[in-house]
């Protein structure tokens, strides 16, 4: 890690995700919080909270009092109204406060975002972040993750998040649009498929997206079952235990046919003489990397392209943020104004 010699600058790396956002600073502070902002439903909530809004895990814990809002809609910023923009503004304000800049200290931040972000999304996020930071740079989250794990060239990074699966061919430079692909099939897509599949098999169960996500987080796997997914649910207010192993498998596998196609498309932008080598250097990051059996399953899906080697990053939930902080520290201070 490069040492921060300028005591008036706090470098911040941010992985801005649909479900969770991760923050790291050049002073060693690190935290993860839910990407949520909650606003009181009525005067009862306002009196109970004593604040106009709550952010992150605190908002989720107090959700019975709140209207919960996500800064991202379908994985993108939602600039439909000024209220929507305020959600993002309040969230960014909170995470910069969490970074704890000292009085008079400048904040230089690199924010990792999905390649799915449009030019309008990037412009809006930069504008809002610049209200709280002196310098801000937006970069592709899978690209940042690849740099963090030492795969800056000759590899493909697959970043499986909550809303998008992002794929990036690492070529030793900032990726161009053709070097990346993004698909809106990831954790939330699996949650919805799992919820519907369980209800189809057990229609009397009381299950929502939160329950489906908890089941997935405990039992997620692809390929051959490694354990029985026997869970306790509620039916007519009573506890019941059901085997949902097959439903978990089917839901977790559901995005990967299209993901494999997108990996193949990204592979095609690599020079043909390098494709076999790159195919042996595929790394998965993000929360989806925790799905059991994933490297072997993705390898089998890529068989038409050749002999693939697929691995999981050492810290899949942190790599994009680590890469963002490292990038922020590597950029000379006098270069920021030129970016």
Curated annotation (Swiss-Prot):
GO terms for biological process: magnetosome assembly. It is an enzyme of class 3 (hydrolase). Disruption phenotype: About 40% reduction in magnetosome alignment; a double mamK-mamK-like deletion has a 65% reduction in magnetosome alignment. The single mamK-like deletion has no effect on MamK turnover rates. Changing residue 15 to N: Loss of ATPase activity. SUPFAM superfamilies: Actin-like ATPase domain. Pfam families: MreB_Mbl. Changing residue 141 to E: Increased ATPase activity. The keyword Lipid metabolism does not apply. Its EC number is 3.6.1.-. Keywords: ATP-binding, Biomineralization, Cytoplasm, Cytoskeleton, Hydrolase, Nucleotide-binding. It catalyses: ATP + H2O = ADP + phosphate + H(+). The keyword Amino-acid biosynthesis does not apply. This bacteria makes up to 20 cubo-octahedral magnetosomes of about 45 nm in diameter which contain membrane-bound crystals of magnetite (Fe(3)O(4)). Despite the presence of Ala-141 (where Glu is expected) this protein has ATPase activity. This is MamK-like protein. It comes from Paramagnetospirillum magneticum (strain ATCC 700264 / AMB-1).
């Amino acid at each position: 890690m490069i040492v921060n010699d300028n005591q008036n600058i706090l470098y911040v790396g941010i992985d801005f995700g649909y479900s969770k956002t991760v923050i790291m600073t050049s002073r060693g502070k690190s935290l993860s919080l839910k990407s949520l902002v909650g606003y009181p439903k009525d005067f009862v909530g306002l009196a109970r909270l004593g604040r106009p809004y709550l952010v992150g895990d605190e908002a989720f814990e107090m959700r019975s009092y709140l209207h919960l809002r996500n800064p991202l809609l379908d994985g993108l910023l939602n600039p439909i109204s000024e209220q929507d923009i305020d959600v993002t503004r309040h969230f960014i304000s909170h995470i910069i406060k969490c970074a704890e800049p000292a009085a008079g200290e400048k904040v230089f931040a690199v924010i990792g975002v999905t390649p799915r972000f449009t030019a309008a999304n990037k412009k809006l996020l930069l504008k809002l972040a610049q209200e709280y930071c002196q310098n801000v740079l937006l970069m592709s989250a899978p690209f940042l993750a690849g740099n963090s794990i030492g795969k800056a060239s000759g590899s493909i990074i697959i970043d499986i998040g909550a809303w998008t699966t992002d794929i990036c061919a690492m070529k030793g430079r900032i990726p161009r649009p053709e070097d990346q692909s993004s698909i809106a099939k990831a954790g939330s897509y699996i949650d919805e498929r799992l919820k519907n599949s369980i209800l189809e098999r057990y229609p009397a169960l009381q299950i929502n997206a939160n329950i489906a996500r908890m089941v997935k987080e405990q039992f997620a796997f692809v390929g051959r079952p490694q354990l029985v997914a026997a869970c306790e649910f509620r039916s007519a207010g009573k506890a019941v235990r059901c085997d949902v192993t097959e439903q978990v498998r089917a839901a977790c596998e559901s995005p990967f046919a299209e993901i494999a196609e997108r990996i193949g498309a990204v592979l095609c932008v690599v020079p043909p003489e390098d494709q076999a080598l790159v195919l042996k250097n595929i790394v998965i990051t993000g929360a989806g990397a925790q799905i059991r059996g994933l490297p072997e399953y993705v390898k089998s899906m890529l068989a038409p392209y050749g002999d693939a080697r697929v691995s999981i990053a050492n810290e899949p939930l942190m790599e994009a943020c680590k890469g963002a902080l490292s990038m922020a520290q590597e950029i000379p201070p006098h270069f920021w104004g030129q970016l």
